[in-house]
A protein has these predicted regions:
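Active-site rim/loop-helix segments in enzyme catalytic domains that contact anionic ligands
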Residues: 1-96, 122-127
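Metal-dependent de-N-acetylase/amidase catalytic core
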Residues: 2, 69-74, 78-176
Length: 176
C-alpha cells in the first residue's frame, strides 16, 4: 500500500490464477471453481494495495513440485521462458515500469510457478529495460522452525514427505 500512497502506479501481474491449490471442504460454494475464488481474492487484495491494474498471464497453475500437473503443456512451469518473458516485458514497457519484484531463484519455498516467476521476471526486465528488479525471499531458519512446529499436526504420510529438518536437508534447505 505504501507505494500507491506515495504516488507510484502499482501494477500486479500473475503467472496463473492459482487453480491447483488445495481446498478444504466447505470453503467454496457449490460449483464454484477455485480459480474464480482466487481471482476475486486477488482483485480485492489489489484494491487494498491501491493497485491500478491487475493482469494474469495465460497459463494454468502447475501445482506443487513433483505433481503430474507440472507436465501439463499449458502450465506456467512448462511455458518457454522467452515467450512468457516477452508477454511480461510488453506490460513493463506499456507501464514504463521502473521496478519489478520477483521471487528468489528458489521460488520462495520451491513452488514451480514461483521459480518460473523468477526466471520470467528476470528475462522480462532485460527485454523491457526495467532498471530495478527486486527479489522476495524467505528466511530459511524461519521456514524450518515453522515446519518443525507444524509437523505435529501432520499425518504420518505427510511427515514422511518432509525433508530431514535436523540433518543435511536443513543445512541446504532452499539452496541449490
Amino acid at each position: 500500500r505504501r507505494a500507491a500512497d506515495q504516488g507510484h502506479r502499482v501494477v500486479l501481474v500473475f503467472g496463473t490464477r492459482g487453480e491447483m491449490g488445495e481446498v478444504q471442504d466447505g470453503f467454496l460454494a457449490d460449483g464454484e471453481p477455485l480459480w474464480q475464488r482466487r481471482v476475486a481474492e486477488t482483485l480485492a487484495s489489489a484494491e487494498i494495495l491501491g493497485a491500478a491494474r491487475v493482469e494474469f498471464l495465460p497459463y494454468i497453475d502447475s501445482g506443487m513440485m513433483g505433481e503430474p500437473s507440472n507436465e501439463d503443456p499449458a502450465c506456467f512451469w512448462q511455458a518457454p521462458v522467452e515467450d512468457a518473458a516477452r508477454q511480461l516485458a510488453d506490460l513493463l514497457v506499456q507501464e514504463s515500469a521502473d521496478v519489478l519484484t520477483v521471487y528468489d531463484d528458489n521460488g520462495g519455498y520451491g513452488h514451480p510457478d514461483h521459480i518460473q516467476v523468477h526466471r520470467v521476471g528476470a528475462r522480462a526486465a532485460e527485454l523491457a529495460g526495467t532498471p530495478g528488479v527486486f527479489e522476495a525471499t524467505m528466511n530459511r531458519d524461519d521456514i524450518i522452525r515453522s515446519m518443525r512446529e507444524s509437523s505435529e499436526y501432520l499425518t504420518e504420510e505427510q511427515r514422511a514427505e518432509m525433508p530431514d529438518l535436523e540433518g543435511e536437508d536443513a543445512q541446504n534447505f532452499g539452496v541449490d
